[in-house]
Amino acid sequence: RDKSIESLTREIEIATTLGVPFLVLHPGAHLGQGGDRGVKRIAKALDGIFRATKKSPVRIALENTAGQGTCLGHRIRHLADIFGRVKQPERLGVCLDTAHFFAAGYDIRTPKGWDAAIAEVGQMIGLKQVLAFHLNDSKTDLNSRVDRHDHIGHGLIGKKAFGHIVNDPRFADTPGCLETPKSPDLH
């Protein structure tokens, strides 16, 4: 854990030098200690990192997760709880991963399902906290809690869903990047 804290502190220092506005980070796992204890541990670590980098404007974008194993972040509430526990929530934001949303049980395949997921983010964290998107299809079923990315249109979310996801006017100025697996047949 100390090495992770040290490493992230160094990454923030490098990002500061390069003018990078935020770093994307999976929140971590509770390792069998329960979600609440895991959130407290994560918030405490972030507080220490923020103290060590107090002059840096770099933010941490917590990424939602699929919920594999004891990973926290598969419920938006987990991310909101971290925001609520850190002493400098203004140093946080979120990165929303489409495959993780789907594997965690958020059915984003329809505009209604997408809107429901985004409404939860808005109510619990705030839409202005969405700093980026990781765009990818999912090789695994809805609510599988297994993190397996696929190429858009090749997975179970489906190509059609990305029409309403990438054209959501609320995020017209929010960056997104493809995070799909390497494949010899795609150039």
Question: What residues fall within each predicted segment?
Answer:
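Active-site acidic/histidine proton-transfer and metal-coordination neighborhood
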Residues: R1-G93
